[in-house]
A protein has these predicted regions:
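Conserved beta-strand-loop-alpha-helix hinge in the C-terminal portion
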Residues: 200-218
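ABC family nucleotide-binding domain
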Residues: 1-190, 195-196, 201
Length: 218
């Protein structure tokens, strides 16, 4: 019997940036999928704020993911036929909610994409597309943003830009972020780093440096 996660109990603070690291097969991606309601645990419970998401039916879980969890993926997952503005506002449209203009303006100006709103994904660089994806994740004011290798397809310059944006979302907008990454240079942007191995959390680190993180991953 394979246990992807084994007796894991962990909490994530509001307004905090947490990175999850570990070798392939360590359980980090499974943990993220369960935290985001994309997979269900075979036992145990998961809470997003005060909601036990493991007790929700499919329809309620879908609504919770749409309204209270923002997703940022390695592959951007933008709709190619929509411009940046429409991609950012898509979660609001799907929820039947009117977007808050002041919040929209604050996000696109903070992320430096106000001059790209009429551009489709094919007309933007990878870094610009990921900024749009971050803006889309922020638009619904989610309880938490879950980021799965968000810089995996980016060059080093775009990686620094996107990580700066996620850091600012935490510091300036009070956003909570949980990120899975294999990259120590990316993980040091976080307030806290969890290291997984064999389905367990083996280290829970704060104030990390690249050197201390490299040592913890050995």
């Amino acid at each position: 019997q394979v246990r992807a996660l084994d007796d894991v109990s962990v909490g994530f603070g509001a307004g905090e940036f947490t990175a999850i690291m570990g070798p392939s097969g360590s359980g980090k991606s499974t943990m993220m999928h369960i935290l985001a309601g994309l997979d269900a645990p075979t036992s145990g419970r998961v809470f997003v704020e005060d909601t036990d998401i493991t007790a929700l039916k499919d329809t309620a879980l879908t609504k919770l993911r749409r309204d209270r969890i923002g997703f940022v993926f390695q592959s951007f997952n933008l709709v190619p036929t929509l411009d940046a503005r429409a991609n950012i506002l898509l979660p609001m449209r799907l929820a039947g909610r009117a977007p808050e203009k002041e919040w929209f303006d604050l996000i696109v100006n903070s992320l430096g994409i106000a001059n790209r709103l009429n551009h489709r994904p094919s007309e933007m660089s990878g870094g610009q597309q990921q900024r749009v994806a971050v803006a889309r994740a922020l638009m619904s004011r989610p309880a938490v943003i879950v980021a799965d290798e968000p810089t995996g397809n980016l060059d080093s310059h775009s990686t620094d830009e996107v990580m700066d944006l996620l850091r600012r979302a935490v510091d300036e907008l009070g956003q909570s972020v949980i990120m899975v990454t294999h990259d120590t240079a990316t993980a040091v942007y976080a307030d806290r780093v969890l290291v997984c191995r064999d389905g367990r959390i083996v280290s829970d680190l704060r104030d990390v440096t690249a050197d201390s993180l490299t040592a913890a991953l050995r």
